[in-house]
Amino acid sequence: MAPMDLSELKNRVSQAVDQMKDELVSISLDIHRNPELAFNEYKAAGWLSGFMEKQGFKVSRNVAGMETDFAAEFQSGEGGPTIAILGEYDALPEVGHACGHNIIGTSAVGAGAALKKALEGSGVNAKVLVLGTPAEEGGGG
């Protein structure tokens, strides 16, 4: 089978985002309502990595010696490039998610999940890797 063309892949990504929109907004709002500081993003990491598991990704936690990090992987076909997406989700003291990390983390998992859906059955070989990076504001990430 010949790989799908780029415009069709883009359309599939867009459709997948539309299908997941309500759940992604809900996750982002949950993270925003529950700000967690550097290295203590247990709820956020749980919601984000749980979403990735639900989307069929292989999820590993504590991959870099941090309790609130995660890596979510999906392989389409054999070989191909690795497409890595980073998502941060920590809050700032006193101002919470003033930097929008609730949106950044949620956008990362949404983009990864949409890309997975687009790649499935496309004939395109690639690995999608979504990395949950804690403590961007506090010396980690």
Positions of the model-derived regions?
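Acidic/His- and Gly-rich active-site-bordering loop/insert found
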Residues: P3-L129
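Fold-level recognition of mixed alpha/beta catalytic cores in primary-metabolism enzymes, strongest
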Residues: G123-G141
